[in-house]
Regions:
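Flexible, active-site-proximal loop/turn residues at the rims of small-molecule/cofactor binding pockets
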Residues: 50, 139, 183, 285
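Amphipathic alpha-helical segments that form well-ordered structural scaffolds
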Residues: 89, 151, 155, 204-211
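Active-site rim/loop-helix segments in enzyme catalytic domains that contact anionic ligands
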Residues: 21-128, 150, 158
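C-terminal accessory domains and tails appended to enzymatic cores
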Residues: 27-28, 163-166, 171-173, 184-188, ...
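Internal alpha/beta domain cores that form substrate/cofactor-binding pockets in large enzymes
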Residues: 63, 100-182, 190-191
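Bacterial N-terminal signal peptides
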Residues: 7-20
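Short acidic, glycine/proline-rich loop/turn micro-motifs
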Residues: 74-77, 188-192
Length: 302
């Protein structure tokens, strides 16, 4: 893999500007500004694709950032060509959701919680003038996932410090920082502070995940040739299986966090919710009460 990576350096260099170009900050129009960080060009879409679509439908500004370029996330491809392919996939997925997409040019599998990367994340949060920041918890099987969580945690206070990254104006108010759910139990399990019904947008989320073909239809880093059918009927069945898997995942979250859904929607409405996403408040950001959470997730009167 090192030899392959070296042979593709010129291609990576050619793609650097494309991979790192930042979208302009949203206008000051009174709408919410949400930025989500994932380790790879599929993580944000899996974790918050439903809520992102709900926010976007109301005109709020949502940005999904992949902290690495995903350039080793396939069993058959790697380097610059894969990075550019995954960037294009993420952009298509995020277009379906109605949100802004950005893929940073850091090698997949090589993310570290350095000062340079802390500054990078801090600048991105400030430039978006975020009200809400979402990231994985720093307890995970994948080092890129862990360090994405650490980097966002480490930015939670620094975004308000004027002379840290003084080239970008600091935020006057610390955003609300939220964690995505996971199933890891040690040192402590995920504890939801809010759960959101995504029934109205579940098909849109599945359509967005459809666009990430290298990961979900070709198997990503753990795929193999037999996983990719050539017969049209089998291809259609493969797509059906992948969509059904993600649909089941959203159903499992609704079942797992049914009591939290009831807190926000009431028992009767919660019992009828089929699909959900959930979030835990990070203690290092602003600590919203229930009323502020309802303003940040303005979906409960629907």
């Amino acid at each position: 893999m090192n030899l392959m990576k070296r042979s593709l350096v010129p291609l990576m260099t050619a793609g650097t500007l494309l991979l790192t170009a930042a979208a302009p900050a949203p206008p000051d129009d009174g709408k919410l500004r949400i930025i989500c960080f994932g380790a790879h060009p599929d993580d944000c879409e899996i974790q918050i694709g439903g809520v992102a679509a709900l926010w976007a439908a109301k005109g709020h500004h949502v940005k999904l950032v992949s902290v690495t370029n995903g350039d080793i996330g396939h069993w058959r491809e790697a380097g610059g060509p894969l990075a550019l392919r995954r960037k294009a996939e993420a952009e298509q997925a995020d277009k379906i959701l109605g949100v802004t997409s950005q893929v940073l040019d850091i090698h997949d599998g090589e993310l570290l919680p350095t000062l340079e990367n802390r500054r990078l994340i801090t600048r991105l949060i400030r430039e978006w003038k975020a009200d809400v920041v979402i990231a994985p918890r720093p307890n995970d099987y994948h080092p890129d996932h862990r360090y994405t969580g650490v980097l966002v945690q480490d930015s939670a206070y620094m975004v308000t410090v004027p002379f840290f990254c003084p080239d970008v104006p600091c935020l006057k108010n610390n955003p609300v920082f939220l964690y995505n759910p996971d199933s890891f139990q040690k040192p402590n399990p995920f504890q939801p502070d809010i759960a959101i019904a995504i029934d109205p947008v579940i098909q849109k989320k599945l359509d967005a995940l459809d666009a990430l073909e290298s990961q979900f239809y070709e198997g990503g880093a753990n795929g193999y040739p037999e996983l990719i059918p050539t017969d049209p009927a089998k291809q259609q069945e493969r797509h059906r299986q992948v969509r059904a898997g993600f649909e089941q995942r959203a159903q499992n979250l609704a079942h797992r966090f049914r009591s939290k859904l009831a807190e926000f929607y009431g028992q009767d409405k919660a019992a009828s919710i089929h699909y959900a996403e959930a979030f835990e408040i990070c203690e290092y950001g602003r600590r919203p009460d229930t009323e502020e959470l309802k303003k940040l997730f303005p979906f409960f009167g629907e």
